[in-house]
Amino acid sequence: MDIIGGQHLRQMWDDLADVYGHKTALICESSGGVVNRYSYLELNQEINRTANLFYTLGIRKGDKVALHLDNCPEFIFCWFGLVKIGAIMVPINARLLREESAWILQNSQACLLVTSAQFYPMYQQIQQEDATQLRHICLTDVELPADDGVSSFTQLKNQQPVTLCYAPPLSTDDTAEILFTSGTTSRPKGVVITHYNLRFAGYYSAWQCALRDDDVYLTVMPAFHIDCQCTAAMAAFSAGATFVLVEKYSARAFWGQVQKYRATVTECIPMMIRTLMVQPPSVNDRQHHLREVMFYLNLSEQEKDAFCERFGVRLLTSYGMTETIVGIIGDRPGDKRRWPSIGRAGFCYEAEIRDDHNRPLPAGEIGEICIKGVPGKTIFKEYFLNPQATARVLEADGWLHTGDTGYRDEEGFFYFVDRRCNMIKRGGENVSCVELENIIAAHPKIQDIVVVGIKDSIRDEAIKAFVVLNEGEILSEEEFFNFCEQNMAKFKVPSYLEIRKDLPRNCSGKIIRKALK
C-alpha cells in the first residue's frame, strides 16, 4: 500500500506552494528574539535558491552535505534544498565536540558543510587533520574569515534564482538524509531515511495529533533530531499548518512563546515538564490555545497529573526512536488514554512483546518491544555502510528489535518498562531504572533524578541515585533513604546517593548514563 501516492519531497514542496501560497508556513525565533516568517510560497523559493546554491558548489544527486546548526531558517532551507536535487542531508548534533563531529564527517562521507561562526574554529582544526572528504564550508553568518574554501551561505543563496535550475529524476526510495543516533551507549550509527520515510512521517504524525491547516505547531526540539523533523516539521508542513521553530528551549520563555504564536500543538520531554513545573506559578499558566502536547517517555503519574492540572493541558503519549521515524505506538485520535500505557500500535504497524528466543509473549509478560514496518517506508531503511548492525536489529520480514522492555494488556495497550541496557542486576533480581526514577521523582524536594548500576563485588551491581534538588532545598541521606524504603521493595532501594547541580544530557534531553558510571 502506497500511503504517499508516489510523491517525493520535491513534488511535495511545489504542491504546498501552489495550494497554500501566502499562508504562513514557517516562523523562526532566535534566542535573541529575532523573528523570521515565511509563507509557503516564500519558503519554497528559499528552498529553491538553496538547492541552486548547492548545485553551483558542485553538489549532485547522492552527495552528502553536513549541517551543524542550531535551530534556524537556514536548517530548513538546506534540508529541503538538498532533497530537491537528490542530495543527502547529514545533520550533526550541535552539542558535539571536535572528535565526535569529525567522526560523523568521516563516516558519512560528507563533502560540504553548512555551519555558523561559533562552530567554525572546530572545523578549521578538523580540516587541518585532513581525515575527511570535506572540501568546502558555507557559513550562515555575515562576517566571513579570509580562508580558502569558505563561502557566505546567505550571499550565495541570495544570488540564486527562485526557480529550481537542476531537477534530476527522483524516487521515493531515494535517501533523503543520514541521521546519526545519539550514541549514548556506543558509537553513533547512521540511520538511513528515505523520501518515502519523511513523506509518510508527515502524514502519520499529522494523523496522530489530528493536525489541520489552521493549527500552529510549536517546537523547541533541536532541528537535527528526529522528533523535530518527523513529529513536528513534516507533520505541520504536510497538513498545511504553521510550523514555529524556536532556537533553544527556555523554561522562563516557553509559555510566553506558546501564547505569542497561539500554538495549538507542541511537544515536551520529561526535562521540559520538570523545569516548567519549578517556575513560579502565574495567573497566565492556563492562558494558551494548546489542545495537544505530544509527550515522550518517561514521567511518574504524580508529575503528569500535576503538570496537566496546573497548565490545563493533556499529554498525547508517543513512543518511538530514530529507527522507527515516528511514534509507532501511542495515543490515537479519539482513543481512550490509559496512563501509564504508551498507547497502541498506529496504522501501518504491528507490535509484539517477545522473549529472549524471539517468541511472542502473551499479555502481562515482560519482554522486548518489537515493531513490524516496511524498511525504507514506515521504518528506517538501514544503518549506513553497516550491514552487521542492521542485521542485529532488523529482520528480513520487517520486524525491528527496539532493545526496550515492556508488556501489553489484553486490549492491546503497551507499557514501557525500560531500556534493556538500563536494567540493573542486583543479587539475582532485575531492577528497572525507570521504575525507581519515577518513584523518587515524586519526592517534593527533587527536581531531576537518574538511577544507574555500579559494580558490586557481592551483588553484581549496586544502585546509585543522582539527584538535582529544587532551588533552595536541602536533602539529607537519611530523609532520602527513608523515602525510598517506604515506597519500594527493599532490594530496589539505592545504596548510594549523590546530589548534583545538573545531569549530563544529549541533544534529545536523554540522560547520558555512561557519563555517570
Swiss-Prot record:
SUPFAM superfamilies: Acetyl-CoA synthetase-like (SSF56801). CDD domains: FACL_DitJ_like. It catalyses: 4-(trimethylamino)butanoate + ATP + CoA = 4-(trimethylamino)butanoyl-CoA + AMP + diphosphate; crotonobetaine + ATP + CoA = crotonobetainyl-CoA + AMP + diphosphate; (R)-carnitine + ATP + CoA = (R)-carnitinyl-CoA + AMP + diphosphate. It comes from the Bacteria. Keywords: Ligase. Pathway: Amine and polyamine metabolism; carnitine metabolism. Belongs to the ATP-dependent AMP-binding enzyme family. This is Crotonobetaine/carnitine--CoA ligase. The gene is caiC.
